[in-house]
Amino acid sequence: YRSLVIMGGGVIGVEFATFYSDLGCEVTVIEGLDRLLPGMDRELGQNLAQLLKKQGVRVFANSMVQRVEQGEDGLTVHFTTRGKEDFVTGEAVLSAFGRSPNWKGLFADGLQPETDGRRIHTDENGQTSIPGIYAIGDVSSPVQLAHVAAAQGTACVERLACRTPSVRLDLVPGCVYCRPEIASVGLTEADGKARDIPVKVGKCTLFANARTMIAGTGRSFMKVVAHAQTGV
């Protein structure tokens, strides 16, 4: 494609934006929330938006897609940004709004677990509302990552064996294959404040790092969020 419109600025959206932009494609990203990567630390999304724009990617945040129309010049995506109508046309449109768990049809009629309409409800042991039936992975977890599902499986079996789980499902490492790459683990600064945890933040730039200099990204940094009293 010579032009691509990506609806959704989460992990999948920005990874494809980076990939197609590097191939010379004209890329536009439309995100409904106030920044890219809304599920990660605010600074990551804000800095990534600047980097993508520097790479030629157009980014529209706080923008809601209204409709997509087929025309002679391609597909036109109509959207509103803070109430103002706008549109962008591309040869193709990628829907990166997210994925829905596919659990329907797994249970017999009359034997349905409690759900919120999307995910299956489980307790702290991974057990559903049906005694003896457990659920792990995308069907029950808000974090749709393969290593999270694997960790949930390990924890579930350990609990069934009356052992204390050896994994921490609240400390999930993750990465984003954009340029430069992003990696994170643990609570964000906003998460800590939302839980009334006193936090202190340390940050250093990586401008002198060899990888940063060779790649020429120019905005690499490391950020550590720790408990203000214990430093952990």
Regions found by a protein language model. Name each.
Residues F87-E114, I130, S184-V232:
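C-terminal catalytic lobe of FAD-dependent flavoproteins
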Residues D138-L145, C178, F207-T212:
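Glycine-rich phosphate/pyrophosphate-binding beta-alpha loops
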Residues Y1-V5, V11-E85, P142-A150, E158-D191:
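Rossmann-like dinucleotide-binding cores of NAD(P)H-dependent redox enzymes
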Residues E69, E85-D86, Q127-T128, G132, ...:
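Solvent-exposed alpha-helices and their adjacent loops that cap or buttress functional pockets
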Residues Y1-R2, F87-L160:
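FAD-site-proximal beta/loop scaffold in flavoenzymes
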Residues G56, H121, V224-A226:
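Conserved N-terminal phosphate-binding loop of PLP-dependent enzymes in the Aspartate aminotransferase
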Residues V57-R58, I133, V199:
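Short, conserved active-site loop motifs that form the nucleotide-linked donor/cofactor pocket
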